[in-house]
Amino acid sequence: MQKKDNQTIRFCKKCLYSSQHPLGIVIDINGICSGCKIHEEKDTINWSKKWLELKKITKNYKLKKQNFYDCIIPVTGANDSFFTVHVVKNLLKMNPLLVCYNKYWNTPLGIKNLSTLRIKFNCDIIFQNVNPIKVKKITKATLYKLGSIYWHSLSGHSVFPVQISIKYKIPLIIWGAHQGLEQVGMYSHHDNVEMTRRYRKDHDLMGIEAENLISSSDNLTESDVFQYFYPDDYELNKVGTRGIYLGNFIRWDVKKQHEEMIKHYDYKTCKTNRTIDCYDYVDSFNYMNLHDRIKLYKHGFSKITDQLCREIRFNRIDRNSALKTAKLYEKKKSLYEKNFCEWLNIDQKSLNYLLDSFKNKDFWKQIDVTKWKFEGLSHLNKKVEIIKKNSKLKYIQNSKIKLDAKYITYGKGIKDF
């Protein structure tokens, strides 16, 4: 527990999250957070019954389909895409249409995984390639306004499937896990929460939809951002668009699921500099690097903390070891920033200066003009020493990304920046 500006910041006694979590978290009188409490449902729910609920939902869409596709699955070259397609195609026996938003910071590994996904599961896929000039304008605007380089990616990935649902009249969209449920216990598994525009705006997009960007930037016009507009309620109701999450019906365990996909479908993984997890976000040069550095600045924790909280809850690592591991990784160098600066046409010093302005004063203390002291949980506890070796958690690394690798921007041809 620490005090900042007359407010108390509390930390969960079981995991590493604080009461300042951007998704909102509740820590009870016993010091246990809502994320840890909801996670306990995974061991008490009758998952066989939940699976039957899912089969009943999807059966209705198979019987009522108006075209060749039973549903839509948003995919990338990483994360839960392989497992989600596996469940839908092989276990639920549905014929999905895959949709993918081009993030433009694609790694060779992500391109390989995306190709493998299409081939192994024999699925049709549609890509959305927004003009890279527009993507750069949007990224520069959100970087200056929100301290976010990932707004365009989060917006595109979450709206493109909905647009395709309207265009092709495919009502059902199937997602993997719900982030708010998994991380902070925003909902119970029993709520069967579904995709909403409100959650997308408030959390994925940091309260700023595409329309808001136009009014808050002198450099953006409607023609720059129209591809990120969410369909209106009339269109959604006409088609009956809804998005469900498999994590409500399956005992969601990302590490276990990834290892199944590695074994059966040759999912490619690699080590990144700022975490022990080799499985998440291997498709992006920036997510586990610059984006993760920004996350540490703004929220006082990075992706390694998300992953360690998850592993604590699955009893694969104890809290003290997790805290030591977080301290080892969370401030490691962010790689490939030169690529980003060249892509966006800004210099590194200007980027660093801008990002300093977004540092959360609850977790960062300014010593002088260029020097800051981090005061997150791992650095507040003086008893926590940096461990020389990684935790006992084991991950399968079957590939590598070279340090001099460049973005693969398949939208308008492949070009080295």
Task: Locate the predicted segments by residue.
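Nucleotide-activated chemistry modules centered on ATP-dependent adenylation/adenylyltransferase
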Residues: 1-71, 87-373, 380-417
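Hydrophobic positions on the alpha1 helix immediately C-terminal to the Walker A/P-loop
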Residues: 83-84
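Short, glycine-rich nucleotide/cofactor-binding loops
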Residues: 71-80
